[in-house]
């Protein structure tokens, strides 16, 4: 064979070998992209980003072989190039954050742009150009904060009580709306009758843990623009009653209860200081999670938990002090009311309720939690069973213990037992809001 043929064969062999080697070292996912330090992103499942042009948005490029070069290109939807630049990276970093360039031309508010990033690594793939990758992200500019219109609200709110607000959040890119009381946020539910608009309804508690009440309706959009409007109610305070309970006077009553097998004083303090708090934490957690569903309150009726008229005793937030030789051993606020029935001890349940808990608690004994929607739940304790009043748990008073929770916060039960209060503070504001909405 001639020399020329041998050279040609050698070239073909070298070229073929390199092509095989190049195919082996070229990898489709040698480089990856992520947004603002999040999980890896790809072009097939990438959601639109909304940008207020304030908080920086960064695309992170990751390459185990080191990043060789990257290019950033910004275009409008009609293919007008706003920015284009390529950068060579000599120090071979394995990761690099590329900040998105803010558009410098006017009139882009409410417009969407395409950001494209091309990158290569320092590998020998692609004829020594390195592995390459491409990422495209749609970014919509939104610098306008949502506006809030309060349609109606309860005329007042009492310390430890409840109120309602119906409002509209105006923003086509709205992401969430809620009510903030102090530093705690309470969910607002969409009013389903007006799905085409961002109409929300929220039951608002004045927590007994806060001596004053300051609330705002808050709306945020997808670009993280936010707005807050003060929620103004006439505020009502209540005088808190106190009740002294002498431990020695309880002995005859509590000795009959099976939980008192050992020292009465020690067991009582243990139940009050630990078991009760543990039960309350569990009750609040269940009510907060399980009461989180929408329900129409337009025809909400006062709670009637017993089969016959009852007498309300031992008020909400009554301060109970347990004494021994005139010394206070323990004290707490009563987070409910006690209802004293007549001869009929049967429980009555509204058909609209959702039973979310039925079981035995250490302090409260056999208990039920039923929820009505919008975060409102009722807690019934010291029951005989799920159908009647009893004396299970540590029961210090006769009758039915009833507590109300609003998004996990204990509130005044007497309000929800009062038909007139419900008409004035709940139903009337709902009707007023609907009339305004029907007018357009």
What is each model feature region?
Residues 348-386:
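Zn2+-dependent peptidoglycan hydrolase active-site motif and core
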Residues 16-42, 129-147:
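Proline/serine/threonine-rich low-complexity linkers at boundaries of modular beta-sandwich domains
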Residues 296-308, 326-360:
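Short, glycine/small-residue-enriched coil/turn segments at secondary-structure junctions
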Residues 312, 368-371, 388-433:
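Conserved, short, structured surface segments that act as functional micro-motifs
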Residues 37-50, 152-158:
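Short beta-strand segments of immunoglobulin-like
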């Amino acid at each position: 064979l001639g020399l020329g043929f041998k050279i040609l064969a050698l070239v073909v062999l070298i070229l073929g070998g390199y092509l095989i080697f190049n195919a082996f070292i070229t990898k489709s996912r040698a480089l990856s992209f992520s947004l603002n330090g999040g999980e890896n992103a790809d072009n097939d499942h990438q959601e639109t980003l909304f940008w207020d042009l304030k908080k920086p948005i960064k695309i992170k490029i990751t390459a185990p072989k080191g990043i060789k070069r990257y290019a950033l290109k910004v275009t409008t939807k009609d293919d007008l190039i706003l920015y284009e630049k390529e950068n060579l990276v000599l120090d071979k970093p394995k990761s690099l954050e590329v900040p998105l360039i803010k558009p410098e031309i006017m009139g882009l508010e409410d417009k969407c742009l395409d950001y494209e990033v091309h990158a290569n690594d320092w590998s020998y793939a692609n004829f020594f150009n390195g592995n390459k990758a491409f990422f495209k992200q749609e970014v919509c500019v939104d610098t306008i904060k949502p506006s809030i219109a309060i349609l109606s609200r309860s005329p007042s709110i009492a310390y430890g009580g409840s109120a309602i607000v119906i409002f509209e959040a105006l923003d086509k890119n709205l992401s969430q709306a809620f009510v903030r009381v102090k530093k705690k946020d309470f969910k607002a539910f969409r009013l389903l009758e007006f799905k085409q608009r961002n109409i929300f309804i929220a039951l608002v508690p004045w927590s007994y843990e806060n001596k004053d009440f300051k609330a705002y309706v808050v709306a945020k959009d997808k670009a993280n623009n936010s707005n807050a409007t003060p929620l103004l109610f006439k505020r009502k305070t209540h005088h808190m009653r106190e009740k002294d309970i002498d431990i020695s006077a309880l002995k005859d009553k509590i000795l009959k209860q099976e939980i008192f097998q050992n020292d009465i004083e020690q067991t009582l303090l243990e139940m009050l200081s630990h078991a009760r708090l543990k039960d309350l934490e569990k009750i609040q957690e269940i009510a907060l999670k399980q009461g989180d569903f929408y329900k129409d309150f337009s025809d909400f009726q006062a709670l009637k938990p017993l089969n016959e008229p009852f007498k309300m005793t031992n008020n909400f937030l009554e301060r109970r002090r347990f004494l021994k030789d005139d010394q206070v051993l323990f004290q707490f606020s009563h987070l409910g009311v006690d209802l004293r029935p007549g001869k009929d001890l049967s429980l009555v349940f509204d058909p609209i309720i959702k039973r979310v808990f039925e079981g035995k608690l250490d302090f409260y004994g056999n208990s039920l939690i039923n929820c009505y929607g919008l975060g409102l739940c009722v807690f019934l304790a010291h029951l005989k069973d799920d159908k009647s009043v009893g004396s299970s748990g540590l029961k210090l008073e006769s009758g039915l213990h009833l507590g109300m929770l609003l998004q996990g916060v204990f509130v005044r039960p007497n309000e929800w037992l009062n038909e007139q209060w419900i008409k004035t503070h709940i139903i009337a504001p709902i009707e007023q809001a609907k009339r305004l909405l029907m007018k357009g």
